[in-house]
Amino acid sequence: MATMMGCSTASSTKMTHTEWCKTRYEAAEELYKAKKYGRTVEKLEEILSTCAGSGYMEQAQFLLAESQFNLEHWIEARGEYGSFIVNFPGSPFAETAEFRKAVSSFNMDYRIDRDESNTTTAMKDFERYLANHPNTPLRDSVNYYYNLLVDRVAEKEFQTGRLYLRMEKPQAAVIYFKEYLETYPKAKHRQEALFLISDAYTDLDQFDPARQYLAIAQNEADKDEKILKRINKANDKIASAEESYEKRLKKESEKKRLQKEEKKLAE
């Protein structure tokens, strides 16, 4: 009888809410360790919706963000890291969460022919991270990502300038190339931009600035024969364009003179 009563008592013992949450969290953790991130996400979302006050919310929120990160669901990962930072700012995982939030932003969909809002968002995330953690050991990694983001913005400026040049809008091209050269002096397309802005000024019949930018290209060529050959060719193009421009001016001037004389004779 005693044995039967003991079994009855044990079987009727109810699991507490905290114990239930602990069991669920440990199961999610095992799935995460097994790299079953999709199933991990499902378990953790259940915990977050049912385990408030259990003591497992912080771990669950962070592990959910990590799972989305490993799934390369960048928008979701950024959102979960952001929620973690807001809800648990004093957590020992907060700095890691803020860094990975920025990395998630960096990895969000990017195409050169689209707007650069994702790039701007990522830059702000890294800037905020450094402002909040100035002594971080991850500074080199932050600088690496940030420089790549700067390259993206520079590339957009450069490609926009090229587009305007192809559209035969040299004045707009000059604006973008000047901005590119002044803002990103070490950008990878700097040399090409010097040639293209020279072409744009030539198209505008502004030959002095066209030659000035070629002179900069020559100073930076460092005896590169291929570049020097291209510079000589560009100078010849400017000279030819200038000669045609002067002939055109002379012709127009002569036309105006004749029109003026004809008008006098008609009076």
Give the residues covered by each predicted segment.
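Bacterial N-terminal signal peptides
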Residues: 1-4
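Acidic, polar-rich low-complexity tracts and alpha-helical solenoid repeat scaffolds
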Residues: 6-267
